Amino acid sequence: MVTPRVRPMGERAFLLEVGALDEVLPLHAALAASRPDGVIDLVPAARTVLVRVDPRVLPPAAARSWALGAATETREATDAASPPVELDIAYDGADLADTARLLRVDAHELARRHAEADWRVAFTGFAPGFGYLVSDDW
């Protein structure tokens, strides 16, 4: 695993920055697997994992040392044991034709390919319930 860059985020948090989402997911899995007391939260994003700590329980320097050590562990990112969720999608957005044109397919083909793909939430955004989806099919 690549050594992440550490970016301070005040006295109670820091970001671990890597190059891409495919590095974030195993990094998050490694951190979650060895999470010590004092780590309040682990928040994955597109290229970072935010680590929030309680400095009364785990000094920030010790937290950074733990995180960098955990980052050297190779872990597979595992999907949570939850059943798939199927959603009804209306493929009638104003940008459907433009998106299809960019992909050099027609709107029906774009809708078919999108509907047949398996998607998973890689991380959530700042708005409650807004998940960023990824698919191995795209």
Language model: regions and residue ranges:
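Conserved "landmark" site that anchors the functional core of diverse proteins
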Residues: 1-138
